[in-house]
């Protein structure tokens, strides 16, 4: 039974981390509805690592292929160096905001902002923001021709995802679309930008819950990690294919329903 719980958490994390519907909100709400324990900091850190590994594996060509390129292929090398710089710039806001929250609001996890009411309202507000993004004129900006101000702006919105119900992928994809990005590349950049953000969150969780790892055991954590890794790969692949010919409408509807259902059950 314990392993089934870890598999469930891994599935929820893997699927909802990349679909624009908020992984934190779903982990919290589904735990309450099913009457099972909160995943805890150690498990959260482990399954988040599974999502990072999935990003690295899925985009391994984008991440690693610039290494060892010949000096003749300057354009290819510059593109990937530029992409790395963009990811770095886009990560700055969440480091500043996340670090400040951890230092000055240490009980943030128990704050009213993480209540069911807050999650429901944020989910509905995010549905409206995603609607604005989906209704905006379809742009042509992509990973090859974006500028660093785009990276910082998307990173700024990513920082707001520390509030449960926002959805890191939802707010970064939406902000990119409003800025004029092409849909598929908006999702791709969102996922790549998630590598340092999710990794930093996992590291912080690990530091503050180191002793929990020994009480849970290696094998259950490995099960959660692998489940997250595999479900994350499915979610990434699905969303990139889906965005080739579709927008955010289905997720907007889902987020409204999700928020309303929570409100009706308060």
UniProtKB/Swiss-Prot annotation:
One Pfam family assigned to this protein is BacA
Q: How does it sit in the membrane?
A: Multi-pass membrane protein
Q: Name one GO biological process term.
A: regulation of cell shape
Q: What are the GO MF terms of this UniProt record?
A: undecaprenyl-diphosphatase activity
Sorted alphabetically, which keywords does the UniProt record give?
Antibiotic resistance, Cell inner membrane, Cell membrane, Cell shape, Cell wall biogenesis/degradation, Hydrolase, Membrane, Peptidoglycan synthesis, Transmembrane, Transmembrane helix
InterPro entries annotated for this entry? UppP
Catalytic activity as recorded in UniProt: di-trans,octa-cis-undecaprenyl diphosphate + H2O = di-trans,octa-cis-undecaprenyl phosphate + phosphate + H(+)
According to the UniProt record, one GO cellular component term is: plasma membrane
Q: Show the stretches that span the lipid bilayer.
A: 39-59, 86-106, 112-132, 153-173, 189-209, 216-236, 246-266
Specify where it is mainly localized.
membrane
EC number, UniProt record:
3.6.1.27
- Where does the protein end up? Cell inner membrane
Which family does this protein fall into? Belongs to the UppP family.
| Classification via HAMAP family | Undec_diphosphatase
Q: What does this protein do?
A: Catalyzes the dephosphorylation of undecaprenyl diphosphate (UPP). Confers resistance to bacitracin.
User: Any additional notes?
Assistant: Bacitracin is thought to be involved in the inhibition of peptidoglycan synthesis by sequestering undecaprenyl diphosphate, thereby reducing the pool of lipid carrier available.
**Protein name per UniProt:** Undecaprenyl-diphosphatase
Annotated source species: Prochlorococcus marinus (strain MIT 9215)
Gene name, per UniProt, is uppP
